[in-house]
Amino acid sequence: MAIYYKFKSARDYDTIAMDGPFISVGILKDKIFETKHLGTGKDLDIVVSNAQTNEEYLDEAMLIPKNTSVLIRRVPGRPRITVITTQEPRIQNKVEDVQAETTNFPVADPSAAEFPEDEYDEFGTDLYSIPDTQDAQHIIPRPHLATADDKVDEESKIQALIDTPALDWQQRQGQDTFGAGRGYGRGMPGRMNGRGFGMERKTPPPGYVCHRCNIPGHFIQHCPTNGDPNYDVKRVKPPTGIPKSMLMATPDGSYSLPSGAVAVLKPNEDAFEKEMEGLPSTTRSVGELPPELKCPLCKEVMKDAALTSKCCYKSFCDKCIRDHIISKSMCVCGRSDVLADDLLPNKTLRDTINRILEAGNDSTENVGSVGHIPDLESARCPPPKALSPTTSVASKGEKKPVLSNNNDASTLKAPMEVAEITSAPRASAEVNVEKPVDACESTQGSVIVKEATVSKLNTQAPKEEMQQQVAAGEPGKKKKKKPRVPGNDMQWNPVPDLAGPDYMMQMGPGPQYFNGMQPGFNGVQPGFNGVQPGFNGFHPGFNGFGGPFPGAMPPFMGYGLNPMDMGFGGGMNMMHPDPFMAQGFGFPNIPPPHRDLAEMGNRMNLQRAMMGRDEAEARNAEMLRKRENERRPEGGKMFRDGENSRMMMNNGTSASASSINPNKSRQAPPPPIHDYDRRRRPEKRLSPEHPPTRKNISPSRDSKRKSERYPDERDRQRDRERSRHQDVDREHDRTRDRRDEDRSRDHRHHRGETERSQHHHRKRSEPPSSEPPVPATKAEIENNLKSSVFARISFPEEETSSGKRRKVPSSSSTSVTDPSASASAAAAVGTSVHRHSSRKEIEVADYESSDEDRHFKRKPSRYARSPPVVVSDVSEDKLRYSKRGKGERSRA
């Protein structure tokens, strides 16, 4: 028996053992305090409530039954009952007496002490000639506690001694909190604008001494010495852990020295100087900076450089040029229609000035690096530019560099940059440094020059470039002699000596050959013969129209050998291709850009577009669905065609054949009836008459791959196959049931006819024959028995179909039932009747066996043999027929 309890935030219940069936709330609380170590219960209390009904047990005398689950929560403790004494009114009177005795103390205005009127004479003169600073110490009467001995007893003294530290503690708590301050207005924190509002009319208890003037009778906020620096208490602390060498004596210090003086920490000048040496020097003289970085107005280094964007394109200090435009309403250059809002910040120049000022080296040593901008574009080395086939005017006398296969940036030069530098005015030549321009530095140009020079260069550069292009186009129209390509470089040199823009062929008129085409073109497709710019995309030396499909590799480029054993294509375009050889590949009809195929010319292969996984799965599922839809109607159609063909062959074909030639009908066996038992259906060769079974219909290789690749698709395909096979099996069962009904009806119809034919056959004599019938030997019978057992195991379909013949050929039935037959055909009719009766006996026995097998859940006994047939009753034709049927089964 126990009570289960837990806090609201706890997860599991704790137990408290109990002796009886009930426990009171008070005892339960005491046990909880004891087990949870919550103390004596004076500071907090516990509220107990039922866990199921949330009922709180307020009365501690309530009884809680056993096995009850309760929730407990802690609440603040209830106030305890105070002890009432009879001396309390006397203590209150003592306090009133003390207040009445000390009512003439100055409490209203602590800045100016007020004295009672009896201390002044009738003329208003002070009776005591004591300085004002001594008034608070000598004039203010000290409360005499000794006079209270006559009025109060010993208990009141003890109570006063107890109350004095408590009041002192409350006063100290009020001083340390927010809002408390020293001097005038000190009081209760946070209210009445920081002024005390409760202590003005309260006097300190007996024994309280002011901590400022050491005089009892008033609180420190009412001390008359407030505001006097002579009474300010300086708090000092001992210099623990600080060496004397780091202390400096000063009257305003906060550390007390052993001598009684106060000191402060001495500043560490050595560490300060060391830190100052590590800082970058920003006190460089203005004369060390280049003149381009100085403002033309104030002649100082530009501060917040700004650029005039509508007139002279010069840079000034932002403040200088803005004040100049506002005051004079015109720019420095003299243009008047400019505003201060048209100024643009020159961030490049600002970054340059900041970097030079932060650097510690001289600007004359790295003049070339002044123009560099610390951004991502300049940090990256630009791709090398190919040289133009036409020479500019500026670089006419220079030696043209030869490009190599490897794009080495160290061997590439920039003649166009040199041309721009050399074509610049002479005014900027003083600042420019004539040295080779590196590939990474070519994008930055020359050194930063004055903004006027830069603006002139910007305006003059387009004109000079136009003139250079016109001058460069004239010599380009003349014929140039093509440099002879070495034999070893003819095959795989993608970058020959004569390179066009971006390593492509030039678009202007080039060397003329017999076909008027550029080198490497065979002139097959006129749309790609260099007329349309941007569509050639091939290197000289390559056949431009060698297709991107796998074919002959260079130097033939898709052409075979001619009778002269000379290669065509590549750089050998002096002879026509052999007209009797295979022609080269041409470009497929593809949309632009053709540069993609030009890049793929080296790989000689086209790549398929990337296909996402979702798109591939959707495509595979669609193909599988189409293939299943195509396969399903074909299978049903083939099944129906096979049934119709077999029915026609059983009914019409055999009847017509027997009516035309009765002898031929006796020799040819009836076609086997196809059994559709799904447990005994064998695999056989496909024929137009027999539809393929479900074993022959196998999924394609693609579907197998898909099924192996995607498990979900494999499961869906398996379900579809299973449902289709079940439909086919149900159709087979219905067909077999109909066939069994027809067979039973034919069996009952022919049983009487068979008995009559046997009786008639015994009465008639056997017809004479040239050769007597050869009886079957024992070995042949055993062989037939073994072969039939083997056929029943291996080929159950043919064996059952041959043993379950239910119909008689129309010729034999006609010969038996026709009473108008001639006497000349009596022998043939007798033989036919004899063979027909023997065959019917075998069929009846087999049918009875199959009927019993079907009765027992259609599980035929494989090794059960039908009743043996008398050998003497079986004729030679019957044996020949059985052997022929066995041969046909073996061939099937």
From Swiss-Prot:
GO terms for molecular function: nucleic acid binding; ubiquitin protein ligase activity; zinc ion binding. It is found in: Nucleus. InterPro entries: DWNN_domain (IPR014891), RBBP6 (IPR033489), Zn_knuckle_CX2CX3GHX4C (IPR025829), Znf_CCHC_sf (IPR036875), Znf_RING/FYVE/PHD (IPR013083). Residues 647-666 have a biased composition (Polar residues). Its EC number is 2.3.2.27. A motif (Nuclear localization signal) lies at residues 693-700. The keyword Amino-acid biosynthesis does not apply. GO terms for cellular component: nucleus. The modification Phosphoserine is found at residues 285, 404, 866. Residues 810-832 have a biased composition (Low complexity). The keyword Zinc applies. Gene3D superfamilies: Phosphatidylinositol 3-kinase Catalytic Subunit, Chain A, domain 1, Zinc finger, CCHC-type, Zinc/RING finger domain, C3HC4 (zinc finger). Disulfide bonds: none annotated. SMART domains: DWNN (SM01180). Keywords: Metal-binding, Nucleus, Phosphoprotein, Transferase, Ubl conjugation pathway, Zinc, Zinc-finger. It holds the Pfam family zf-CCHC_2. Residues 375-408, 459-493, 623-892 are annotated as: Disordered. Residues 3-76 form the DWNN domain. Residues 623-644, 674-692, 708-745, 875-892 have a biased composition (Basic and acidic residues). A zinc finger (RING-type) spans 295-333. A zinc finger (CCHC-type) spans 210-224. It catalyses: S-ubiquitinyl-[E2 ubiquitin-conjugating enzyme]-L-cysteine + [acceptor protein]-L-lysine = [E2 ubiquitin-conjugating enzyme]-L-cysteine + N(6)-ubiquitinyl-[acceptor protein]-L-lysine. GO terms for biological process: mRNA processing; protein ubiquitination. PANTHER family: E3 UBIQUITIN LIGASE PQT3-LIKE, RETINOBLASTOMA-BINDING PROTEIN 6. This is E3 ubiquitin ligase PQT3-like. It comes from Arabidopsis thaliana.
